[in-house]
Regions:
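N-terminal, positively charged nucleic-acid-binding surface of large information/translation enzymes
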Residues: 2-198
Length: 198
């Protein structure tokens, strides 16, 4: 049973947590050192057969939600564990620079409608916005410490990437692995088109 004295002293006790602030500039210095040393860049011919991670390129939206950070952190753990075993690791950083998300973003930011804007002008607006958003995303990726190959980044709107995906599609078609069928799709009435499941 508590005595009145203890109850009074308990009332007077006000615990305080002395806040220790983490200097995030320290993280930037460490990451810059890793970049300078080429820690995340694949060095062909060193360490044997490279370990390759096929990363899904995030949509270039400028912001990274916690789910994306969690997913890429899991990929990053695999990349780091393979490096710790002495393997050269190809962990490419890519950006999906196509799709409705980009078009909607540009329409809102530029206050224009895609259908009312000359095609090349709208493509230029998208390209400029994507470059800006990509820079923001790279900064976020670096802030969370992702160990991807930033020097070898790729874009889904680059000609070489499109040629590769088209050649792959044709090869799969020739093998009979591509088929056409009817299935339910997500449809956006506002955009007037189907949208991805993701």
């Amino acid at each position: 049973m508590a005595t009145p004295e203890k109850t009074e002293s308990a009332k007077k006790f006000l615990p305080r947590i002395v806040e220790k602030r983490w200097d995030h500039h320290l993280e930037a210095k460490i990451f810059d050192q890793w970049q300078e040393e080429g820690t995340f860049t694949v060095k062909p011919g060193k360490g044997g057969k490279p370990f390759v991670i096929d990363t899904p390129p995030p949509t270039t939206s400028g912001t990274w939600h916690i789910g994306a950070v969690a997913s890429y952190s899991q990929i990053d753990m695999i990349a780091r564990s393979q490096r710790m075993q002495g393997k050269p690791v190809l962990f490419p950083i890519g950006f999906d620079r196509n799709g409705i998300n980009v078009e909607i973003y540009v329409e809102k930011q530029s206050k224009v409608k895609m259908r009312d804007t000359p095609r090349q002008q709208f493509i230029d607006l998208c390209s400029h916005a994507l470059d800006e958003l990509e820079g923001q995303m790279i900064n976020m990726m670096k802030r969370v410490g992702l160990s991807g190959d930033y020097d070898g980044k790729y874009h889904t709107d680059h000609e070489s990437y499109r040629k590769l995906t088209q050649a792959t599609f044709i090869e799969l078609w020739k093998r009979g692995l591509i088929y056409e069928t009817t299935r339910p799709n997500n449809y956006c009435h506002e955009c007037g088109t189907t949208i991805a499941d993701a």
